[in-house]
Amino acid sequence: MPKMSNLKNSSRSNEYLMESEEENIRLEIKTDPEALRKQALWCGIKPGMRVLDAGCGTGKTTSILHEMIQPDGCVVGIDFSETRMSFAKENYGKKKGIEFHLGDFRKSMKNLGQFDFIWVRFLLEYYRKEAIDIVKNLKKCVRPGGLLCLLDLDYNCLNHYELPVPLTRILPKIMNYADKKYNFDTFVGRKLYSFLYDSGFEKIDVALMAHNLIFGEIKDKDKFNWVKKVEIAAKKAEKLINSYPGGYQQFSSDLNKFLIDPRRFTYTPLLLCKGVRPFSS
């Protein structure tokens, strides 16, 4: 189990929309091992592979991928956050065949070598302007015949029924603000296929799964994740939140009431897209 004393962040990054003192906690709690394994199997992960986890965060996902490629597989996690890297190394980096590197996936990664399988999950949504360039850069790290797998959300945070009218009006404004101000991409999921197609990948395949699918009594981990999102929104889009009837307090109250209402329905589509690097490229 990860050490709870190390879950809080000691530093911030101006590049990451969701940065907060408790981001390590949020990432650890929200990652569903069973769902992740199902997604990785669809993507084609196999024992013995050399895997790159791009944007590995706290390393929990990297550790699960490491388990799936045994025996004889190895995995490398890369992230730009010193806080996340420190946590990942301490909690997941002590097993044979797993290592973590501080780095920027927008720059050359030749020092890491080539991989049979590259996993890019919940990363491109934070790089709306650079997403296609990141994919093309990662392609250089895929061995000919290897797989690049992109997984991300579409219509992020916007699929709910039946929201109070003020929430219905403000949520799209908040997401639009995040897109423009923080380089986020609310609709990146629908773009993944084109990223692989335009980057010259072959045998491209796409699947659609539910990421959030919340009905009836809400699970503690889902409530925690959404509450943290509200807190971040309040800080990053303060003017918008203050324009809500009743201000932040009413916004938070309305959203919390909606989340705990068992009649509520919330979902977020997850797009999975994989492609093979041709031997000719």
What does each model-identified segment do?
Residues 149-218:
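Conserved catalytic/acceptor-binding region of the Class I
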Residues 109-118:
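A short acidic, Gly/Pro-enriched loop at the edge of an enzyme's catalytic core
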Residues 30-49, 64:
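Conserved alpha-helix/loop element of class I SAM-dependent methyltransferases that forms part
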Residues 132-147:
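A short glycine-rich, Lys/Arg-flanked "PGG" loop and its adjoining helix->strand segment in the class I
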Residues 52-54, 58-108, 133:
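Class I SAM-dependent methyltransferase SAM/SAH-binding core
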Residues 70, 127-128, 142-144:
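Helix-to-beta-strand junctions that scaffold the AdoMet/dcAdoMet cofactor pocket
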Residues 13-17, 21-23, 207-265:
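C-terminal helical/coil "lid" or tail adjacent to the Rossmann-like core of SAM-dependent
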Residues 1-28:
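N-terminal, positively charged/glycine-rich alpha-helical extensions of SAM-dependent methyltransferases
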